[in-house]
Amino acid sequence: MNDPKVVVALDFDRKQDALSFVDKIQPTDARLKVGKEMFTYFGPEFVKQLTGKGFDVFLDLKFHDIPNTVAKAVTAAADLGVWMVNVHASGGSQMMTKAKQALDNYGNDAPLLIAVTVLTSMGQEDLHGLGINKTPAEQVNFLANLTKQSGLDGVVCSAWEAEQLKADLGKEFKLITPGIRPAGSAQDDQQRIMTPKQAIDVGVDYLVIGRPITKAVDPQLVLQQINGTIR
């Protein structure tokens, strides 16, 4: 079974620009991530256009609400035919468990359900401001364990956390990582980066990469080069 490891983060202001980009790459080489901005602008029909072109879609909306509402939201995502959808682990075990149970009826067609632990923008002071007396690393570990206990498929994490999380949570628990930059590319707004090969080597399962691919003159060539380093 084809299992592309690269997930291209689509960040376009215009739908046509996004679709023009997508036409330059192959679904056998990458999956696509649709976040809050593009989903708010272009809606479910945009996701259907992408899946209609043969792409697996990671719907990155980070649901966080009461359990019934989140369960209905992930059901709607499953009905859209997405490959992966996420929630905030800080919504708690009941919310995550109910969301996972809502996907039971989809069997093998259910999307992967993953959780976000601590946002990469949050530091020690931010957590303390929320009454959380843990370091970011401790809170990531706590929420990742809660995610697994709740039956979810994996977490979004930093590549720097991946090796420890994979050791603690097992090979089957998926790790999805942003902040990946091919060797030689600009860092953009990501301060701590790893190359695709480095990330895979420490246990990351799926690599979220944006501008180094979306801004490339030949994105398919860049994808092939990245894939060549991790296969």
UniProtKB/Swiss-Prot annotation:
HAMAP family: OMPdecase_type1_B (MF_01200_B)
Function of the molecule: Catalyzes the decarboxylation of orotidine 5'-monophosphate (OMP) to uridine 5'-monophosphate (UMP).
Name of the featured protein: Orotidine 5'-phosphate decarboxylase
Cited SUPFAM superfamilies: Ribulose-phoshate binding barrel
Cellular component, GO, one term: cytosol
Domain of life assignment: Bacteria
Enzyme class: lyase
Binding site for substrate: 11, 33, 60-69, 120, 181, 190, 210-211
Keywords: Decarboxylase, Lyase, Pyrimidine biosynthesis
A Pfam family the protein falls into: OMPdecase
EC number, as in UniProt: 4.1.1.23
Assembly with partners or alone: Homodimer.
Pathway: Pyrimidine metabolism; UMP biosynthesis via de novo pathway; UMP from orotate: step 2/2
Catalytic activity: orotidine 5'-phosphate + H(+) = UMP + CO2
GO molecular function: orotidine-5'-phosphate decarboxylase activity
Residues of the active site: 62 (proton donor)
InterPro entries in the record: Aldolase_TIM, OMPdecase, OMPdecase_AS, OMPdecase_bac, OMPdeCOase_dom, RibuloseP-bd_barrel
UniProt cross-references to Gene3D superfamilies, sorted A to Z: Aldolase class I (3.20.20.70)
Annotated family: Belongs to the OMP decarboxylase family. Type 1 subfamily.
UniProt-listed GO biological process terms: 'de novo' pyrimidine nucleobase biosynthetic process; 'de novo' UMP biosynthetic process
Entry-linked CDD domains: OMP_decarboxylase_like
